[in-house]
């Protein structure tokens, strides 16, 4: 069974929940922020987007854009995301977004494991997001087999067949 969803970052206004539903969107994955737990590294639209989705009864999940290159960096980013989630447990889980070229050469398996273990300890469903090329070229450690994968395959055609 296919379920139609979108991922968003920044404020989605003037888009409304009715617009999303009219487009057939059944769930949304919202960006919480990026990097470690420092002021200003939260997504500018996260809180408002979640409020809009919850009011409309649209289930959501969340992703965090990573710059972590170590296990401790992944843990720090998880703590940042947990603070931004503020106790919420999104139905569509939380996702560790690994696609920053600046992280290449770092301990990517350790960063992912630190993030994912921290989120699981908080009672959240967690997975790892990356593009097809990242999965094929950089995220090849068996550590990644412990977590669900969200594989981004971009398309320029609306309604094209792709997975997320």
Which stretches of residues belong to each language-model region?
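Glycine-rich anion/phosphate-binding loops
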Residues: 42-45, 68-82
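Surface-exposed substrate-engagement region within the catalytic domains
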Residues: 22-26, 79-95, 99-157
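Boundary/entry segment of secreted carbohydrate-active catalytic domains
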Residues: 1-33
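Single conserved hydrophobic/aromatic residue that forms the stacking wall/gate
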Residues: 158-164
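Short beta-strand/loop segments at the ligand-binding rim of alpha/beta enzyme cores
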Residues: 2-4, 59, 125-126
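Short, well-structured secondary-structure segments
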Residues: 25-38, 50-69, 93-94
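Active-site beta-loop-alpha junctions enriched in small/polar residues
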Residues: 8-11, 33-35, 65-69, 99-101, ...
């Amino acid at each position: 069974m296919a379920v139609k969803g979108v991922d968003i970052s920044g404020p989605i206004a003037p888009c409304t929940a009715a617009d999303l539903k009219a487009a057939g969107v059944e769930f949304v994955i919202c960006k919480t922020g990026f990097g470690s737990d420092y002021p200003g590294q939260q997504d500018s639209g996260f809180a408002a987007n979640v409020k809009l989705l919850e009011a409309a009864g649209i289930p959501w999940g969340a992703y965090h854009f990573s710059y972590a290159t170590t296990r401790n960096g992944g843990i720090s980013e998880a703590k940042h995301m947990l603070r931004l989630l503020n106790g919420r447990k999104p139905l569509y889980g939380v996702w560790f977004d690994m696609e920053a070229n600046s992280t290449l050469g770092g301990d990517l398996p350790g960063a992912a494991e630190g993030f994912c273990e921290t989120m699981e300890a908080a009672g959240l469903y967690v997975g790892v997001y990356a593009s097809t090329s990242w999965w094929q070229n950089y995220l090849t450690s068996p550590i990644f087999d412990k977590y669900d994968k969200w594989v981004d395959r971009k398309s320029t055609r609306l309604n094209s067949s792709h997975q997320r």
